[in-house]
């Protein structure tokens, strides 16, 4: 960032008074430009004993499988964002139910919120960001072709909870440790 979005003046990267980290600061108008984590919202779309996955048509992780999810937009709730992302990526309409998982990914400044959801019908197809969209039972899931560790972790917990009759909110941190991604419970 080079210029202030409020007044157009050049900005400086420094620690503002009363803060503990460097921020982009405009000395002309006093605006402090904060850069905060992004919220990623998505669904675990269920149909009978199967869930809907999307094969990515974009980078990162082109060609790998994921749940329909993406960045939350201004002016929408997390549930609305999850439903919108499912419609965009899988052309699927869902009833968004309870929040299933919340994972912090501090190494990429993201927070994932994934909701259990019910497919309203079997009318789905790849959206612009998907190569393919399919329903999978647990035994059919291409575990070695999952796009992101957070999705693989969420699905592992989901199927374990479903088999055991559990369903409490799952939360944790997925952090990079020496090139490895590991999950730690909060």
Question: Which residues does each PLM region occupy?
Answer:
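Acidic, metal-coordinating catalytic segment for phosphate/diphosphate chemistry
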Residues: 1-42
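Nucleotide phosphate-binding site architecture
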Residues: 5, 12, 27, 52, ...
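Unchanged
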Residues: 72-157, 161, 166-168, 180-186
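Short connector loops at helix/strand junctions that flank enzyme active sites
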Residues: 21, 36-40, 46-48, 60-62, ...
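Active-site donor-binding loop signature of nucleotide-sugar glycosyltransferases
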Residues: 28, 56, 69, 117, ...
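Conserved hydrophobic/aromatic beta-strand scaffold that supports enzyme active sites
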Residues: 3, 23, 44, 53, ...
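Conserved Nudix-box catalytic region and its N-terminal flanking loop in Nudix hydrolases
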Residues: 46-88
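Short, highly charged C-terminal tails/helix-capping segments
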Residues: 171-178
């Amino acid at each position: 960032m080079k210029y202030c979005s409020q007044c157009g003046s050049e900005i400086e990267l420094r620690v503002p008074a009363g803060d503990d980290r460097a921020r982009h600061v405009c000395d002309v108008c006093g605006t402090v430009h904060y850069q905060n984590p992004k919220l990623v919202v998505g669904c675990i779309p269920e149909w009978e004993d199967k869930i809907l996955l999307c094969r990515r048509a974009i980078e990162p992780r082109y060609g790998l499988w994921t749940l329909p999810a993406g960045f939350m937009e201004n002016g929408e709730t997390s549930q609305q964002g999850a439903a919108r992302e499912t419609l965009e990526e899988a052309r699927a309409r869902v009833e968004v139910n309870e929040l299933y998982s919340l994972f912090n990914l501090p190494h990429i400044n993201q927070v994932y919120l994934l909701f259990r959801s019910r497919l309203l019908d079997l009318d789905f197809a790849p959206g612009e960001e998907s190569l393919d969209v399919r329903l999978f039972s647990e035994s059919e899931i291409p575990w070695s072709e999952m796009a992101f560790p957070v999705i693989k972790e969420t699905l592992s917990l989901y199927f374990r909870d479903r088999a055991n009759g559990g369903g409490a909110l799952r939360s944790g941190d997925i952090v990079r440790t020496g090139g490895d991604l590991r999950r730690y419970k909060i």
